[in-house]
Structure formats: C-alpha cells, structure tokens
A protein has these predicted regions:
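Active-site entrance/lid segments in N-terminal catalytic domains of soluble metabolic enzymes
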Residues: 15-16, 45, 50-166
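An N-cap/entry alpha-helix motif that binds or orients negatively charged groups
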Residues: 1-31, 112, 116-126
C-alpha cells in the first residue's frame, strides 16, 4: 500500500484480496538458461519478502525478483517515496524541468506514470537469507526466483569499499 511504510508492507503485505487464477500447464520457454512457464515477471522493488513472492507467483508471474538486498540492514526513505507524476508541458529534449506531481490520477493505466525512490532498503542478511530460502520453496515448477543484490560502501569508503562489499 502506497499509504503505508515499507516496514508496514513488509510485515503485513501483500493485501491482495481477490481470487487467484487457475494456472494451466504451458510449454516452457528459455530464460537465460532456465526453463520457465512464461517470460512474464516482476522486477525488483515490490516483492518485499516470501509472502509477496508467493502471492505474485500464484497470480501467474513466473520470473520473480526478490526485493534488493544488501550486506547490512538499511532503512527505507520516509513517505512520500512513491508519487504519480505528469509532464509540465511537452517533453523537450535536454530540459531539466519536465515532471511535476500529478494533479489527478487517470483511471486509464496507459496514462499513469509514477516516480519511486525507496532508497533500496534491506533487512539484515540473517533475515533475508532465511526468507529467500522460504521464497524458493513457494515457487511452482517453471518459475524462477531472482534476487536483486546491491553493494553498500562503508561510510567514506569510496569505490574500493563498494567493490569489496559487493
């Protein structure tokens, strides 16, 4: 939920209340050397933990990217960290001022654009490692779990620190 914090969504989400579709067997496709039911997936960001992975796998997504993790815990940026935006005027190449917060949100998904900056929060490694194992156990045959990993430099550590962490 956009009106709740990352921590709240991590603990309580997802809040999906619909029914799950019946998933039929399909001929498998190749995806970077792995066989998957489809190439329909979820990018890094919204699958905060194994509950989120399980929900989206049951909704029919077959390539599921576990929320970005780090070698240490990192908090999320405070709200608002996800806003709907619209162009200020016609998009001009090279212009710095091109977007503003949307005055109203369109009901047509093709007209909706959002800007997100969560700050790539992460649970501590001992938490996410155990949860990634749990997430893998919730996948069906033909589904693939990708874990998004990012390096975190030590305070004032520079490039060498980032490389060492990664």
């Amino acid at each position: 939920r956009r009106d709740r914090s990352y921590r709240w969504n991590y603990r309580n989400g997802p809040t999906f209340t619909g029914s799950f579709p019946r998933i039929t067997d399909a001929s498998q496709k190749e995806f970077f050397g792995s066989k998957v039911n489809s190439r329909l997936g979820v990018a890094a960001g919204i699958l905060l933990n194994s509950r989120w992975v399980e929900c989206y796998s049951r909704l029919g997504f077959d390539i599921l990217t576990y929320k970005t993790v780090r070698s240490s815990e990192r908090p999320c940026y405070p709200l608002p960290n996800w806003v709907f935006v619209e162009p200020i005027n016609d998009l001009e190449p090279g212009s710095d001022e091109i977007l503003r917060k949307a005055r109203r949100r369109s009901r047509d998904p093709a007209e909706v654009t959002s800007a997100v900056c969560f700050g790539m929060p992460s649970q501590p490694p001992e938490v996410w490692r155990k949860d990634v194992r749990s997430a893998r156990g919730k996948l069906r045959r033909g589904q693939l779990l990708v874990v998004s990993v990012v390096g975190t430099p030590a305070e004032g550590g520079g490039e060498a620190s980032l490389v060492e962490d990664f």
